[in-house]
């Protein structure tokens, strides 16, 4: 006949350790069935929406208008005809006459040309950075979700849910996607990030709109490079089907 064995302090500690280990093992699965499951569904819906719309946009050409403001001084806008190339990258062809050469003496022209080249190089770096955020990358979104770096801010009255990604492309950044849960479309994206150092802050506000066939596209972006006192507003318009339909 078996005897009942009374556990001492050591036995209690062992049971607590086993319980803690079991909790650590099964907590992620439990989270998936609750709030974590809802979060995963929202992230999956965003990924699907982005992928579908990117595919549709390959069938269009459009006009991009860029307005640059440096230290509060607006520069002449520029326009480009855009469409996706075979490699999935946007091809841009300048529209309108070329920019006028700077006025003044040779020294002034040289200074102005150098400044323009510096801004052009910086903008190239900024656009390379922001390309990691817009359009949102499905792999980055999934990775952030798996690392527990994603949270939800639902707004039932509007039907729009904010999905917040932290440490999305680099440590300390944040990307917030506003997703219309009824239309299953991204309505806006807001990014807070930086260039080489956290003090070199770069923000991006993106507004989306829909074409007649319900394709979602980036209507306007406002890029603010605080350290350079540079604001770049880009507007996309006049979408036309490449098939002429």
Predicted feature descriptions by range:
Residues 17-26:
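Bacterial N-terminal signal peptides
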Residues 2-18:
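Bacterial N-terminal signal peptides that target proteins for export
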Residues 154, 179-181, 208-212:
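Short, low-complexity Ser/Thr-rich regulatory SLiMs
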Residues 27-31:
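Sec/Tat signal peptide C-region and signal peptidase I cleavage site
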Residues 177, 188-190:
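Periplasmic/lumenal scaffold domains of single-pass inner-membrane subunits
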């Amino acid at each position: 006949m078996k005897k009942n064995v009374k556990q001492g302090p050591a036995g209690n500690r062992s049971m607590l350790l086993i319980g803690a280990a079991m909790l650590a093992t099964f907590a992620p699965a439990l989270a998936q069935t609750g709030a974590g499951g809802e979060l995963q569904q929202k992230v999956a819906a965003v990924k699907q929406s982005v992928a579908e719309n990117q595919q549709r946009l390959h069938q269009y050409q459009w006009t991009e208008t860029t307005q640059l403001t440096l230290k509060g001084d607006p520069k002449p806008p520029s326009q480009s005809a855009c469409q996706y190339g075979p490699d999935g990258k946007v091809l841009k062809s300048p529209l309108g006459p070329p920019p006028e050469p700077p006025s003044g003496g040779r020294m002034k022209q040289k200074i102005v040309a150098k400044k323009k080249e510096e801004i052009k190089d910086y903008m190239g770096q900024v656009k390379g950075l922001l390309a990691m955020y817009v359009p949102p990358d499905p792999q980055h979104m999934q990775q952030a979700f798996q690392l527990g770096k994603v949270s939800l801010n639902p707004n039932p009255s509007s039907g729009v849910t904010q999905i917040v990604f932290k440490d999305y492309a680099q440590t300390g950044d944040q990307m917030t996607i506003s997703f219309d849960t009824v239309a299953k479309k991204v309505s806006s994206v807001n990014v807070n990030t930086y260039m080489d150092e956290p003090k070199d802050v770069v923000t991006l506000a993106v507004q989306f709109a829909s074409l007649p066939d319900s394709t979602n596209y980036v209507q306007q972006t406002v890029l603010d490079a605080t350290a350079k006192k540079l604001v770049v507003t880009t507007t996309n318009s006049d979408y036309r089907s490449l098939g002429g339909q």
